[in-house]
Amino acid sequence: MAPPPPSPPSVTLRTVLLLLRVLTAAFLVITVVLISTNTVTLEVSSTSIKMRFNDVYAYRYMLSAAVIGLLYAVVQLFLTISQFATGTTHPLNYQFNFYGDKIISYLLATGSAAGFGVSKDLKETFLALIEFDSTDPVDKFFSKGYASASLLLFAFVSLAVLSVFSSLALSKRPIQVS
């Protein structure tokens, strides 16, 4: 005799999961917009140099992590809304949620760490080479880098919380023997 199917999560838990997915996607959308529009023009000894986010490898990695995370968040939003509407969960969703949440959360964490590290190092380097103050465009460039890294960190935290829920859901799911 087959074991009974797992009981679906309560409406309150599903609502919390949906809100966390929306929050993750919102953080990632803002991160993508903020980092992809990050540019500065430097005037150094009558030479104009335009610096973009894609001139810094760590910012490119941060943007890539945010875009991949955003794609995953959108897919998960659709799956969560579907589960919310139907009240049922496909058996493969447990594993997809478990592994996806773990992998993408680590990707977001490393992207955030890269953004914080390069913002700190490059800002100190620029300050050592050229006299800048807090109103300078270079400072704003790196402040946007810090803001993007912070939002990516917030997205990681909300996805890490979702990862705990997906771990619990997978562990409570009965093992199916073929």
Curated annotation (Swiss-Prot):
UniProt keyword terms in alphabetical order: Cell membrane, Membrane, Transmembrane, Transmembrane helix
Pfam assignment, any one: CASP_dom
Segments traversing the membrane: 15-35, 61-81, 150-170
Residue spans, topological domain Extracellular: 36-60, 171-178
Membrane-topology annotation of the record: Multi-pass membrane protein
Presence of the UniProt keyword Metal-binding in the record: no
Cellular component aspect of the GO annotation: plasma membrane
Protein family (similarity comment): Belongs to the Casparian strip membrane proteins (CASP) family.
Name of the protein described by the UniProt record: CASP-like protein 4D1
Native source species: Arabidopsis lyrata subsp. lyrata
Organism phylogeny: Eukaryota, Viridiplantae, Streptophyta, Embryophyta, Tracheophyta
